[in-house]
Structure formats: structure tokens, C-alpha cells
């Protein structure tokens, strides 16, 4: 067909999966992105939106299922925006993620020989998330609902028991819902900016069993809070109950003001032997089982013997820094978010670690300044940047400092490939690469790479 229009129907075979988890199929050279499909599916689809050389379509029916297609466990898998790959066999998900890393390293990084180790998958790829944020709303019959947003929308898909989350979520949400109904608490409306209850944050320490609940409200205080606390304390492990004030017209979920209702205001958890204190506003990896494997790999790649000076850039609350400090002489952590550095310093104290020092600021500003003014030294540099990757000034300073090893932890293998190419062109050799599946059933994959100075 020379020109595709909305609602045109067609058949195609899915050949690949996009970065966002849509299946990719072609008809006469025209590329289609089709949600809820798996590589190998032959489907009938309906065009929803078309551009010059590609379009988006809705899968109408599966004509011939892929050998790697499975029945999703979750009843709302198709509507919910959280799991893009749940219809794909888990082993095939891992293969897809490995291929994604490999392809980015060859196409973007220009690497011809990639020393790639097998991806670290999960033995049990369900119930792995230690944190969930549930929005509240009303359905068409004016019943209170909570769950998750449908893909690319703010329409709530009712789901109190996400199979990626902890089993306690459902009981906690039922208590909160009953409390709202009992006392007639109004739900927040994004369009009118009226109503009180916005979200519920739930966190759990997997190794300690400690639970946290934080209600996000569009108001100064939470009515009938004593009754809510009394009910929530019936759940084993309940350690911290609070509310967060967020009166802004914003998509940001948490407000900066947190008022404590019960407990110490935080929960604790361990990654390996390191203890972490987690408040409602703390960043903490959501999959602690895989985080331990990811950081263990980073620590192994760092090759520490006890005498090294290590810089940990984009260090967050010091999760990798404290892991490294167990085996290094000195660790310096850098992070732009002041609250995260406060948490990092508290976590260092909590573990009695005196060989760690933290700086607040941008990695691309702190590292050059420390290098030029104070001639700081590094045997090993570890980076764990956001999705956009490392700033070029930061990479340039790493090259000037000349550490023996650079360990790169990445949540986006495309920007990883770009940055590895930059370092490889300036005296470093790619020695090892390994994927780690932190988010089963989604299209995301973490990667750890080791570069050594030639």
C-alpha cells in the first residue's frame, strides 16, 4: 500500500521489540510498532497513527502465536503500562535483553569483539519490587479504585495486587480504602486540583521484613489518622506510617514535607552485609535481590585488594560506595541531590564506615575541581549515571586521572555504548560486559562494564 491511513487493517510478523517494549513488524518496507506482541507472532493489526515511514498499530488478533509466547499471569497485563514483556517467555526475555546490549555496543559503540558474560536473570521473576506508588481515583460507577496508570495515560487500571509487588500491598490498600469510605475522605482530582488523597507509597525491607506506608495528600493534615494507624498496625512488620504533603499541581508524586504518624520515620534493609536506612523520600533500588548481584558484579570488576582509592560518581544514597568501602582503602562519592548525600552519610555512620567521604554536586563539576585543585587520585572509578549517561567533561576528567580500572553501571545500553566508545578511543580497553535483569517483564536492562587502562 502506498499510503497507510488510520483504521487500515493489515497482517505482519513481529521481527523485533522496541526500546519501549512494542513489537516491530514490517509491511512493504513500512515499519509498525505494535503493543502486546512477541517476536515471532503473526498478527492482524489496525493502524492507529501513521508517519512517513513508520506507524503505530493496535493488535487485533494473533493469527499464529510465537513459540515464545506465554499467557500473562496478570489479569490486567494488556491494559497496564508497567509490564511490556509479560507475554514473552522469561528465558526469551533474557535473550532479548542480552541482544539489546550486544547490538548497542556494536552499532553505537563500534565494538567488534565484545567480552560478554551471560546475563544475570532472576530465579523467581515475580514479587521482586520492594516499592510501589498507588494513585487513587474513581471508576465510572463512582467507586474508589487504585492501581496503576494505563500506558501513556493517567487513567487508573484497578489493581490492588500487582504480581511484581509484595503480597502485603493488597491488605494495606484494602485498609486504606475502607478508611476513606468510612470517613468520607475525598480523592484528589488532577483536573480540578481538589480533593485530599493523592497516592499511597508502600515500601518493604526484604531482609528485615519492615514495612512503610506513606499517604500523599493535597492538604495540611490527614483526618482520622489515629484510626488509620490502628488498622495498619494489624499488618505484621508495619514499622513506619507517615504522610507527605503535596499541594502542587504536578506529576511529581511525593511532596518534600513528611509528617510522621508512627515509628521512627524510616525502615531498614540490607544489601549484602551493608545496612541501609530508607525514608519515604530516599532513593533505593526497587529490586534488592538483583541489586545485590549487580553491585557484587561491580565490586568484582573493581578488583579491590584493600589499598585502593575509589571514586563513585552519581552515587545516590551511597549504595555502591558502601559496598566498595568494605574492600577499599578510601571511597569518595559524588551526587547532585543533597538529600541523597545526607542519607549516604547516615548509612556510612550506621555501618561504622569511616573510609567514605561524600560530595554534593554534579559529577562533571566536582571531579574536575578536585582533580585540578587538590590533585586527587583514583585507582578505580565507578560510574552509575542516569539514563542520559555521563557528561563529556566527566569522561574527559576520568581519562586525565587515568585510573587502572573504570567500572560503568548503566540503565541504558545505548548511552553506555556511546560513553564506552569515548573511553576506548582514549586508552581504555573493554574487558568485560554483563547484563543484569533488574526489571523482569519490562524492556529495561542494567549493564555492568569493565574498562582497563591499556
PLM segments and residue spans:
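Extended interfacial segments that mediate partner engagement and assembly in macromolecular machines
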Residues: 60-72, 78-187, 207, 222
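Flexible loop/N-cap segments at domain edges
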Residues: 200
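Terminal RNA-binding accessory module
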Residues: 1-72, 76, 357-358, 365
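Short, acidic/hydrophobic/Gly-rich beta-strand patch recurrent on exposed beta strands
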Residues: 23-28, 147-150, 214-216, 344
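Short beta-strand micro-motifs enriched in acidic
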Residues: 46-50, 135-139, 203-207, 454
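Conserved loop-to-beta-strand segment in the C-terminal subdomain of adenylate-forming
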Residues: 54, 208-212, 443
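Short, conserved phosphate/pyrophosphate- and ester-handling motifs at nucleotide-, phospho-/glycolipid
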Residues: 40, 165, 287
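Rossmann-like S-adenosyl-L-methionine
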Residues: 2-11, 19, 220, 224-235, ...
Amino acid at each position: 500500500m502506498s499510503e497507510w491511513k488510520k483504521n487500515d487493517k493489515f497482517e505482519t510478523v513481529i521481527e523485533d521489540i522496541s526500546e519501549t517494549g512494542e513489537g516491530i513488524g514490517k509491511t512493504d518496507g513500512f515499519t509498525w510498532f505494535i503493543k502486546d506482541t512477541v517476536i515471532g507472532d503473526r498478527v492482524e493489526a489496525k493502524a492507529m497513527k501513521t508517519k512517513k515511514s513508520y506507524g503505530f498499530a493496535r493488535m487485533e488478533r494473533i493469527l499464529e502465536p510465537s513459540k515464545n509466547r506465554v499467557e500473562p499471569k496478570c489479569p490486567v497485563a494488556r491494559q497496564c503500562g508497567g509490564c511490556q514483556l509479560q507475554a514473552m517467555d522469561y528465558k526469551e526475555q533474557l535473550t532479548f535483553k542480552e541482544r539489546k546490549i550486544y547490538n548497542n555496543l556494536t552499532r553505537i559503540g563500534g565494538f567488534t569483539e565484545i567480552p560478554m558474560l551471560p546475563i544475570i536473570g532472576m530465579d523467581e521473576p515475580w514479587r521482586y519490587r520492594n516499592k510501589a506508588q498507588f494513585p487513587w481515583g474513581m471508576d465510572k460507577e463512582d467507586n474508589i479504585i487504585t492501581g496503576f496508570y494505563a500506558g501513556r495515560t493517567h487513567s487508573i487500571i484497578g489493581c490492588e495486587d500487582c504480581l511484581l509487588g509484595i503480597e502485603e500491598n493488597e491488605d494495606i490498600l484494602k485498609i486504606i480504602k475502607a478508611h476513606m469510605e468510612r470517613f468520607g475522605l475525598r480523592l484528589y482530582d488532577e483536573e480540578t486540583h481538589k480533593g485530599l488523597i493523592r497516592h499511597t507509597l508502600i515500601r518493604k525491607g526484604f531482609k528485615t521484613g519492615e514495612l512503610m506506608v506513606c499517604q500523599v495528600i493535597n492538604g495540611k493534615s490527614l483526618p482520622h489518622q489515629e484510626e488509620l494507624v490502628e488498622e495498619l498496625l494489624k499488618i505484621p512488620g508495619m514499622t513506619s506510617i507517615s504522610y507527605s504533603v503535596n499541594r502542587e499541581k504536578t506529576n511529581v508524586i511525593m511532596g518534600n514535607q513528611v509528617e510522621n504518624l508512627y515509628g521512627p520515620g524510616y525502615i531498614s534493609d540490607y544489601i549484602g552485609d551493608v545496612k541501609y536506612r530508607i525514608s519515604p523520600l530516599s532513593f533505593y533500588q526497587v529490586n534488592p535481590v538483583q541489586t545485590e548481584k549487580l553491585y557484587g558484579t561491580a565490586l568484582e570488576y573493581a578488583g579491590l585488594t584493600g589499598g585502593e582509592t575509589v571514586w563513585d560518581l552519581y552515587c545516590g544514597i551511597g549504595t555502591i560506595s558502601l559496598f566498595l568501602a568494605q574492600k577499599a582503602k578510601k571511597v569518595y562519592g559524588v551526587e547532585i541531590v543533597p538529600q541523597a548525600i545526607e542519607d549516604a552519610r547516615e548509612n556510612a555512620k550506621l555501618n561504622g564506615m569511616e573510609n567514605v567521604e561524600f560530595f554534593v554536586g554534579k559529577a562533571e563539576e566536582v571531579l574536575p575541581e578536585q582533580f585540578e585543585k587538590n590533585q586527587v587520585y583514583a585507582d578505580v572509578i565507578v560510574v552509575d549515571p542516569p539514563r542520559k549517561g555521563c557528561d563529556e567533561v566527566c569522561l574527559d576528567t576520568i581519562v586525565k586521572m587515568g585510573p587502572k580500572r573504570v567500572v560503568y553501571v548503566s540503565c541504558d545500553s545505548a548511552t553506555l555504548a556511546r560513553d564506552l566508545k569515548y573511553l576506548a578511543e582514549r586508552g581504555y580497553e573493554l574487558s568485560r560486559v554483563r547484563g543484569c535483569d533488574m526489571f523482569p517483564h519490562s524492556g529495561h536492562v542494567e549493564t555492568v562494564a569493565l574498562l582497563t587502562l591499556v
